């Protein structure tokens, strides 16, 4: 993946300015911006590029900016230091953070060579967050994929932990990055309570090259799910997983995958946490109660992800948890927002009834009023995670 000069008159690519063999630059394969072209505020000249890999990286082509980066990195050690120039061009705003420390913002005066802290996010957490480990793994078809894992503080080689495989939403979205993201936040909560957590960037996750992205199309409920299992297999091979105590979790697509994996790989996971989950893909893409069916481009891309134009086909039923409820073995925890217009709550009630009819009613189904596709109120999130932790403790019983 690279950034080239472009001649608009000749409509031709020119010289290669910067490249990365693994990560997208400028924009991901799905068109979303994953990394920025950096320009000088004074003259709009291109001075560098930002690569959003497993850890963010800045490639400077301007020598002075490269020297400034080196100076900041030597002062703010063991942190990722991203900076941009103020609109008046007189100073730099620095965003400094790490996997174990929330962001702090500084103002760097180049002329005076002074660095002044101007804001901090949750400074009481500095150094107290669990370490975020990037990893690479190969899917069963040979596709190289990436992810992160977290271990409880004080973990030693040979220690085995109850483990949560957290699946991000989308699925065609980059949900987690270095030090931030819904999955990263959940992993931090769980790791501080004695759990190991694995966050796979499965096929169709943008930002990791066109092959990894486009390999996901047509594999919904199939190879995409294989990747979740293969990430767990990698983690088991690393030696930190207690294979008898593994749960799968996620929201939106991640909630879908959590339910479908219990049906697809019985015995692999003891339990599932499924939030905001589409459970009937035909309903999801046709009901006007939700916003997806109202978007022609949205339905079109979803048909390509499913690999079929026929939403009423048996193939779509086969990858819908609602029609596999009798195969779902293991304890299920569900949650939803009453006002969700992305995944209408009716689907969650459908799977609740289907699981109950199959003799495996959800252990808990948390519904919050005036919440949508994700909970925004602090009190609702506190209650949700209090209940999730109790559920996991009951199912997996961590030693500490």
Task: Please provide the spans of the model-predicted regions.
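The start of beta-strands in P-loop NTPase/AAA+ ATPase cores
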Residues: 161-163, 331
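Hydrophobic beta-strand anchors of alpha/beta hydrolase catalytic cores
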Residues: 164-166, 197
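The conserved beta1-alpha1 loop
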Residues: 167-169, 336
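Active-site-proximal cap/loop segments of hydrolase catalytic domains
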Residues: 184, 189, 199-400
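Short beta-strand segments enriched for Tyr within beta-sheet-rich domains
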Residues: 161, 195, 269-270
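Peripheral, non-catalytic segments that deliver or gate enzyme domains
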Residues: 1-146, 150-160, 171-182, 186-193, ...
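Histidine-centered divalent metal-coordination motifs
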Residues: 146, 168, 373
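Acidic helix/loop microenvironments that form the catalytic cleft of cell-wall polysaccharide enzymes
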Residues: 169-171, 253-254
């Amino acid at each position: 993946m690279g950034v080239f000069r472009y001649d608009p008159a000749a409509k031709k690519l020119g010289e290669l300015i910067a490249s990365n063999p693994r990560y997208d630059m400028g924009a991901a394969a799905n068109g979303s911006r994953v990394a920025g072209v950096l320009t000088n505020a004074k003259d709009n000249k291109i001075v560098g590029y930002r690569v959003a890999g497993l850890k963010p990286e800045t490639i400077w082509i301007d020598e002075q900016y490269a020297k400034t980066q080196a100076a900041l990195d030597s002062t703010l050690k063991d942190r990722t230091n991203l900076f941009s120039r103020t609109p008046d061009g007189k100073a730099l705003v620095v965003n400094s953070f790490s996997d174990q420390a929330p962001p702090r913002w500084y103002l760097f005066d180049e002329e005076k060579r002074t660095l002044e802290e101007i804001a901090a996010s949750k400074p009481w957490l500095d150094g107290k967050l669990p370490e975020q480990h990037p990893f690479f793994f190969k899917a069963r078809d040979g596709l190289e994929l990436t992810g992160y894992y977290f271990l409880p503080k004080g973990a030693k080689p040979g220690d085995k932990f109850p483990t949560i495989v957290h699946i991000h939403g989308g699925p065609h979205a980059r949900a987690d990055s270095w030090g931030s993201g819904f999955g990263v936040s959940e992993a931090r909560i769980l790791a501080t309570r004695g759990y190991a957590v694995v966050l796979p960037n499965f096929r169709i996750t943008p930002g990791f090259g066109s092959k990894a992205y486009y390999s996901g199309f047509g594999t919904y409920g199939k190879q995409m799910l294989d990747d979740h299992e293969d990430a767990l297999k990698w983690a088991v091979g690393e030696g930190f997983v207690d294979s008898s105590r593994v749960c799968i979790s996620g929201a939106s697509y991640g909630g879908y995958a959590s339910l479908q994996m219990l049906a697809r790989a019985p015995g692999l996971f003891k339990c599932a946490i499924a939030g905001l989950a589409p459970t009937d893909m035909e309903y999801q893409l046709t009901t006007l109660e939700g916003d997806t069916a109202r978007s022609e481009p949205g339905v079109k891309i979803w048909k390509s992800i499913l690999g079929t134009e026929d939403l009423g086909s048996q193939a779509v039923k086969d990858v819908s948890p609602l029609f596999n409820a009798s195969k779902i073995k293991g304890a299920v925890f569900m949650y939803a927002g009453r006002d969700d217009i992305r995944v209408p709550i009716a689907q969650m009630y459908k799977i609740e009834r289907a699981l109950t009819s199959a003799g495996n009613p959800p252990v808990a189904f948390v519904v919050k009023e005036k919440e949508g596709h994700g909970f925004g109120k602090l009190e609702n999130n506190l209650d949700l995670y209090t209940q999730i932790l109790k559920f996991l403790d009951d199912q997996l019983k961590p030693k500490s």
